[in-house]
């Protein structure tokens, strides 16, 4: 145990350049690379981020395109957003454009279904 304490003390006293040199020497002697564990750690860190994205509860509904039935899409947009006819038409004409934000998943899916039934292309973000 005393030997480990000595090694720890010696390693702690190394400069950054000396530590980098030591790493290179050990890599050559043992035939390993210090880069491999870093790549594994990075891949492991990406997994929780993917889980967080999968657990998303609020969505933004983005109207991507009106499709062939523009009048039907305008009517549905008007009903969903509560906008006037002119504002709803403007929103549809300016697609792709966010239509509604902070919408719960069930409501977002329902709205997406209505818009797609009218002929629109919609994305949930």
From Swiss-Prot:
UniProt gene name: rplL
Subunit structure: Homodimer. Part of the ribosomal stalk of the 50S ribosomal subunit. Forms a multimeric L10(L12)X complex, where L10 forms an elongated spine to which 2 to 4 L12 dimers bind in a sequential fashion. Binds GTP-bound translation factors.
GO CC, alphabetical: cytoplasm; ribonucleoprotein complex; ribosome
Pfam families for this protein: Ribosomal_L12, Ribosomal_L12_N
Family affiliation: Belongs to the bacterial ribosomal protein bL12 family.
Protein function: Forms part of the ribosomal stalk which helps the ribosome interact with GTP-bound translation factors. Is thus essential for accurate translation.
Molecular function via GO: mRNA binding; structural constituent of ribosome
Protein name: Large ribosomal subunit protein bL12
Protein source organism: Rickettsia felis (strain ATCC VR-1525 / URRWXCal2) (Rickettsia azadi)
């Amino acid at each position: 145990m005393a030997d480990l304490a000595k090694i720890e003390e010696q390693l702690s006293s190394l400069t950054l350049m000396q530590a980098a040199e030591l790493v290179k020497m050990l890599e050559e002697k043992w035939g390993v690379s210090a880069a491999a564990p870093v790549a594994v750690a990075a891949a492991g860190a990406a997994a929780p981020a993917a889980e967080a994205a999968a657990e998303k509860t609020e969505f933004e509904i983005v109207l991507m395109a009106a499709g062939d039935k523009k009048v039907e899409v305008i009517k549905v947009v008007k009903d969903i957003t509560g906008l006037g006819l002119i504002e709803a038409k403007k929103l549809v004409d300016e697609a792709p454009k966010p239509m509604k934000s902070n919408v719960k998943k069930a409501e977002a899916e329902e709205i997406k279904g209505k818009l797609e039934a009218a002929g629109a292309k919609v994305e949930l973000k």
